[in-house]
Amino acid sequence: MLAEVRGLNEECGVFGIWGHEDAAQITYYGLQSLQHRGQEGAGIVATDGKHLHGVKGEGLVTEVFTQKKVQELPGFGAIGHVRYTTAGGGGYENVQPLLFHSQSGSLALAHNGNLINATSLKHQLEGQGSIFQTTSDTEVLAHLIRRGGFGTMKDQVKHALSMLKGAYAFLIMTENELMVALDPNGLRPLSIGQLGEAFCVASETCAFDIVGAKFIRDVEPGELLIINKDGMRSERFSMATNQSICTMEYVYFSRPDSDIHGINVHSARKRSGIQLAKEMNIEADVVTGVPDSSISAAIGFAEATGIPYEMGLIKNRYVGRTFIQPSQSLREQGVKMKLSPVRGVVEGKRVVMVDDSIVRGTTSRRIVKMLKDAGALEVHVCITSPPIKNPCYYGIDTSTREELISASHSAEELRQAIGADSLTFLSVEGLIEAIGHEKQNSHCGQCLACFTGEYPTEILPDTMHPHDKELMC
């Protein structure tokens, strides 16, 4: 369903290109394809080999950039960013890419993820004389690079990356080089493509399709790619890797036409609907999915059960951005404005409502009420992921247990709270099976922490909400 009314949001998306005469224009198109990953800000920095030039602003890509602004960014290399605020707060100064100028040259950074040791590193750097211009955790990397004391930029970057903990997919650009880095756990998706002689990098492969690039491969955990006039080469900044891609990328965040580690997102969601149907028995008249991210799963559920699939809920695509706000009252109003039941489909019917997840419960409760007000006899809520009981510290805006309804309610209590006739969640094992990763480790290469509480990295105290610290004691 829509992030605007869900309150479950990815931090951002990144796109970069090197070796193309229209680098900024290609990046603009790439960012548009990643708009679902962040709607609060957008920016592009381009290089002509001598200088870095940037444009950024708050709002959607089309609100920040006119054609004239894009044309004011000449050069053969560019990086871009779309942002949803989860760490450091909003505001123009935190919109990325962040651009820094010094006597030794310029540096631009774009980041998807969340650094769980940013606070302690910032205190350490400030003690050494660093002055921070933003409240974004991304700026920490810039100061670490500049204070590295090593001879080459590559060595400075490697040393800086070795000090970071958490989730990060970084694009790092100077006047003459683009570097790409993914954290040792590979928590966020990042892929490499090729457009003619140019190299592209993006948070999702759907961006390559939009700009006409050919997918090459996914960036590996702990890998640093260096792209310049000599081509692209790969090095390691960490050998201690443990692939743990965020499972919610498949469940909700990524576009259905994207592939992550060779697995198509639409296909994974459809299989999750099929798997959920195998794990339960239900008698109903119609299956409907909550637009947009649950449509694939609903189709799979309908195919597996033989219950007809219908468009029982319609999304209003023309509501303004007033509701892209991180407040509960606007989320509730947003549900009403963004979704409408189709009375002719649900009236007098036993309805299976397929959705991808329940975070706070507000959305599910209001949709169930909508369907019943439209005449549904029964509403059976089927969730194609396990209950989300644990906060995410890796770049998703669920950083406290208090805001997760499944952390304090049983499935039956939650069913009563949302007013459903039944409520069923997909099992952890079923979700792993549906996604279909090779069993390369105990968690099949996925981060399942929001469901299981087993985090792939150490969770530092300064990352946690005070209430959650007490629970961990």
Segments and roles (model prediction):
Residues 65, 134, 139, 309-320, ...:
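A conserved beta-strand->alpha-helix junction
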Residues 159, 207, 214-215, 219-223, ...:
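Phosphate/diphosphate-binding loops
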Residues 130, 150-151, 281-285, 303-310, ...:
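Secondary-structure transition/capping motifs at alpha-helix termini
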Residues 1-221, 226-284, 290, 378:
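Conserved short alpha-helical segments that host acidic/polar catalytic motifs at enzyme active sites
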Residues 20, 147-150, 197, 307, ...:
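Short, well-ordered loop/turn and helix-capping segments at boundaries between secondary-structure elements
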Residues 110, 173, 181-182, 193, ...:
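Generic beta-strand/beta-sheet core signal
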Residues 306-351, 362, 389-395:
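Short, glycine/charge-rich flexible loops or terminal/linker lids adjacent to PRPP-binding catalytic cores
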Residues 161, 176-177, 212-218, 369-473:
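PRPP-dependent phosphoribosyltransferase catalytic core
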